[in-house]
UniProtKB/Swiss-Prot annotation:
Family annotation (CDD domains): Prefoldin_URI1
Keywords: Chromosome, Coiled coil, Cytoplasm, Nucleus, Protein phosphatase inhibitor
Protein name: Unconventional prefoldin RPB5 interactor-like protein
Disulfide bonds: none
Compositional bias (Polar residues): 205-217, 508-518, 575-599, 623-644
SUPFAM superfamilies to which the protein is assigned, alphabetical: Prefoldin
Organism (species): Drosophila melanogaster (Fruit fly)
Amino acid sequence: MDRREDALLQALQTNASETERWEAFKRDNESTIRNLDKFAKNLSVEVMVPIGRKALMPGELIHTNELLVGHYEGYFSACSSHKAKEICQYRLKLAEEQLKKLAVENDLWQKKLHTPFAEGAVPSGDQVEIVEDFNEESHNKWLAEHRKRMRQQKQKERLEREAEPVKKDNEVLRKLEEREMMEELGLDPDNIDEDQLHDMLNQEPLKSTNESSPKSLTQEEEDELWKKLEAEEQNEADELSSEAEESLKTTDNLVRQLMSGETETPSSKKRTAGTNRNVEIQDPISEDDGDDDDEGDQEEEVRTIREQMSLLPNEDREPFLRAQLHVLKAKMRKIQKVNFISDELIHLMNVVVMLEDDLQDLVFEQELEASEEEEEVVENNHLPDEPSKELSTVSESSTNKRRISFALDDEKLEFRREETVAEMLPNAKKNSRDIIKLNAPLKPAGDPQPASIKTKRQTTQDILQKVERNIEFVKENQSVQDFDLLNRIMEESTGLINTLHISFTHSGAIPSPSSDQSDGIPGKPSDFYVRYEKDRARPNDSFPIYVNGFEGEEHVKVPIMSEAARGSAYEDPRSQFSKPNSSEICFTHSGSITPTSNDQSDDIPGNPFDFYEKYEKDRAKFSKSNSSEGDATDPESATKSILRNKSAVDLEPHNVNQQPKKGRKVRNQKKKERTLDDDLRDMSAYQKVMHDLVEKEPTAPEPLPPGKFIDSHAPKKRVSRFKEQRALNKT
C-alpha cells in the first residue's frame, strides 16, 4: 500500500508541474495577442529598452507590422502581425486542450488515491476485514445433494402435468367466448351469477338450431312463423304508449315501401308548394340548415354516388340514380331474408332515404325547366285580353322557383379549344335578357305588366350559328390586306426597281409626216427611236440608279466617275491655298506717262507701276535662264516617251509643291534662296485668304470644288430601309 501511495503521489506531482508549465504558456500567448493588437494600430511604439540586467532606456519600436516568429530548433519565420496573431491563437487552443487532459488525469489519480479509504475498501482505524473459511470437501458434498434435490423436483412437476386433463385449451377458448358474450349483452362479468351464465350457455345450441331451421322451412311453416311474429309485435304494441305506437307504424310502413320499391317521399319543395308566401320564405332557410347538419352525417355510399353524379350530364343523372336505388333495394331484400332487423339494414335504409331525396330534387328541377319553357311559349303567344291569367301563372311559377342552394364541392372549369362556353358549363343557368321589339303592338297603360319577361334560352346550335355569321361578315366587309399586314410590309420593304429595256432597229424607210401629234407624244414606233437618240445626245448629269435604292441615297454611296473627275473630287480642298498661281495677279497697262521719282531705289517699288516693271524684268530673266538650261540639258526632247497614256498623265492634276523626302545625307545642305515667284505666290495666298475673311459672311460654309465626293472624316449615316419605307407609306 505504501508503494502504491508513493506512485500515485509522484504522478500527482508530475501532473501539477505540467499544468503549471502549460498555464504559463497560455498566459504568454494571451499577452502576445494583446501586444499585437496594440502595436498593429501604430507605425511605431514607445517602449523602455533593457540595457543589461538593471538598466533601461527609452526607445521606440518600428516596423510593428513585421514580426519574426520563433519555431522549434532555432527556426524562425518573418510574417505580418495578423499572421502572428493566428499562430498565437492556435497555440492558445493547443494549451487549453492540454490543460483539459491534465485536469482529467489529476481527477483520476485523486480518485485512485482517496477512494479506497472513503468507500471502505481498505480498513482504517477500528475497521476489520471480513474473512470467511472455505472447505472444498464440504462444498463438493453440498453440490451433490443439490443436484439430487433438483432431479426429484423436476420428476414431481412432470407427474403433475401428466395428471392434468387434456382439454385445457378448450377451456381457455370457452372462457374467452363467455367474456365476448357478456360484452355483447352488456353484462358485468364481476357481478353476474354463475348459474345464470351456465343456463345461457346451455341454451346457445338450441338457438343455433332454430336459426339454421328457416333455411329448410316450407311455405306453410314460414307463414306460421310470420303470424307468430306479428302476434308478438301486436302484444308489444298494446303495451306501448300512443306516441311510440305511431312511430312504430310509420317505421313499418317505410320499411315495407322500401322493400316493395313503391316509395314516393314528398320532397320539401312539394310540401311547401301549397303554403303561403310567409312559409315559403322560411322553408328554404330551414332546409339549408338541415343540409348543413346532414353534411357531416352523410354516408360513404351517398357521398360516392353524388360524386359520380356530378361528373355526368343532366340527362343521365336521373337514370343513374334510379339504377343505384334499385341495386340497394335488392340488397336490402337479401339481408332481410337472413335477419329481419340488423345494423346493415338500417344503414342501407338511411342511404336509400337520402338518395330518394336527391331523386325528388332532380325531378323537381326538370319540372321547373319544363314549366319555364311552357311559360316562354305562353308569353310569346299570349293575348292582351288575358292579363289576369298571365299574372296568376307568374305568381305560381315564382312560388315554385323559390329556392336557395349551395354547391357541395368546388367546380372546376376546363377550357377546351374545340368546345363553346355553354358546353364547358353544362350546369350553368344562363341569364335571360329582355328583348325589345320595334314592331310589337302597344299595350294599354292600365293593363298590369308581368313581373318578368322571359326570353328563349340560347342553345349550343344558336351560338355556333352566330359565330358563323360573324365570320362571314368579317370575310365580306374587312379588307384582306388587314389580315396580311405583315406580308404587305415585307413586300414594300423588299421591292425591286425593274428597268424596261427596249431595243430598236433602224429602218431606212421614210416616216410619213404627221401634223396631229405633238413632239412629246410618240405616235408610232419610230418616235421612240427619235426620242431615244435625243435623250442619248443630252448630257446625263443624273445620279446612277441603284437596285433597292431610295431618295437621298446619293449622299451615302460612292458615285461612279471617270479617273480625271475622281482625282479632282478626292483632292483636299486645303491644297488650293498652297498652289502657286501667277495668273491671279492681273495688271492692266495704261498709256499714261509715269512720273519720275529720284528718292527711291530701284529695288523698292514706290507705286503699282513699279510692281509691273519688276514683274516684267524678273519674267524675262526667268524665261531666258530656262531656255538656256533646256537647250543644254533636255535629252527627252530628242527621244520618244515610254508612257503609253501620256496625254492622260498630262491631264491629271499633280501637286507641284510635292518634293522628295530628304534623307540624312542632305540635312546639312543650304536652304534654297527665295525668288520673286515665291513672294508672289505667298502674297496671292494671303490676299485670297484675307478676301475670303472680309467679304464672305462668317456663317457661310467654305466652298467645295465641283464634283460629287464623300467626306472621309465624317461618319456615315446608317439608314434603315425598313424605316424609310415605313415613313413613305405613312405619307
